[in-house]
Regions:
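Short, charged/polar micro-motifs that form catalytic or ligand-binding hotspots
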Residues: 1, 35-39, 65, 69
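Short amphipathic alpha-helical interface segments
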Residues: 2-37
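Non-catalytic, well-ordered alpha-helical scaffold segments
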Residues: 5-9, 43-46, 55, 77
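Generic structural signal for hydrophobic core residues of well-folded globular domains
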Residues: 15-19, 52, 83
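Short amphipathic alpha-helical interaction segments
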Residues: 38-55, 70
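A short, conserved structural fragment
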Residues: 53-64
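Short, amphipathic alpha-helical interaction segments positioned at domain boundaries
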Residues: 67-83
Length: 83
């Protein structure tokens, strides 16, 4: 899959909006409530979240149910710089 920087940016902006000291970003294939992520397929979102983790842009990625559910702790300093 080709890396889409717009998708990466939309994911990071969505994570930034949701996350705080007590709240993490939760994405589910079955209930994508994030307006910024609506233009992207589930596979695109999962791929780009994993790329964000590999690039050190997000912390604490957790996946379950074969990738149908993902949880992200927050942005890293590099994630904030990217934005």
């Amino acid at each position: 899959m080709r890396l889409n920087n717009d998708c990466v940016r939309d994911i990071l902006l969505s994570v930034e909006e949701v996350c705080d000291f007590n709240e993490s970003f939760r994405y589910s294939k079955f209930s994508n409530d994030f307006e910024r992520l609506q233009p992207y397929s589930h596979d695109e979102i999962i791929y780009h979240i994993k790329q964000c983790e590999l690039a050190g842009l997000i912390t604490s990625m957790f996946g379950a149910d074969g990738g149908d559910y993902l949880e992200v702790g927050d942005l890293t300093p590099e994630g904030h710089k990217f934005l």
